[in-house]
Amino acid sequence: MTSFVRGGFVENRKFRINQFIKVPEVRLVDFDGTMIGVIKTADALAKAQAKDLDLVEISPQANPPVCRIINFSKFKYEMEKKEKEARKKQKIFHIKEVRIRPRISDHDLEVKIKHAREFIDGGDKVQLTALFSGREMQHKDLGIKIMERIKESLADIACPERKVYSMGMRVFLTLVPKNKIK
């Protein structure tokens, strides 16, 4: 929860606690979850200190702000734990690129398809790129045909994220593993 600032480290405060709460009145919630009501901040801080706990501003946007009497270090630990679990559950796709030329031979194309299949089996997205140069641009249909051929050969394990599209001197196709799609 700290970040480096020129001159040293500064703690990033997401929540204002104890004497850092500067509003005159707060809506207080006890440590067991019962609503105490709107009271002066000094009184709320005294109640928290009497129980050896912290007064934490939970909802600063409310009028008056909602504060809770809790153990702040335990609260911070639980928040970090929730954030860590949320990061674990995120799906991370890595995009692997396979480049081909429009005049690729059949064997070389099979090797490229094999590489794409390995990437897809590994759970990654695959972006296929057909590179054109010079007068090859007049025959973009060759690149599109090659992309369609690759799409058909990998149809058992992947499906296209979107249609084959071209941008500049390239033609693109992005394939996503079927088991990753919901």
Swiss-Prot record:
Keyword Protein biosynthesis annotated: yes
Domain of life: Bacteria
UniProt-listed GO biological process terms: ribosome disassembly
Localization per Swiss-Prot or TrEMBL: Cytoplasm
PROSITE patterns: IF3 (PS00938)
Primary site of residence: cytoplasm
Subunit structure: Monomer.
GO cellular component: cytosol; membrane
Gene that encodes it: infC
Signal peptide per UniProt: none
Function: IF-3 binds to the 30S ribosomal subunit and shifts the equilibrium between 70S ribosomes and their 50S and 30S subunits in favor of the free subunits, thus enhancing the availability of 30S subunits on which protein synthesis initiation begins.
Organism of this sequence: Endomicrobium trichonymphae
Record-level Gene Ontology MF annotations: ribosome binding; translation initiation factor activity
Gene3D superfamilies: Translation initiation factor 3 (IF-3), C-terminal domain (3.30.110.10), Translation initiation factor 3 (IF-3), N-terminal domain (3.10.20.80)
Keyword Ubl conjugation: no
Family: Belongs to the IF-3 family.
Disulphide-bridged cysteine pairs: none
Record keywords: Cytoplasm, Initiation factor, Protein biosynthesis
Protein name: Translation initiation factor IF-3
Pfam families, A to Z: IF3_C, IF3_N
Entry-linked InterPro entries: T_IF-3_C_sf, T_IF-3_N_sf, Translation_initiation_fac3_CS, Translation_initiation_fac_3, Translation_initiation_fac_3_C, Translation_initiation_fac_3_N
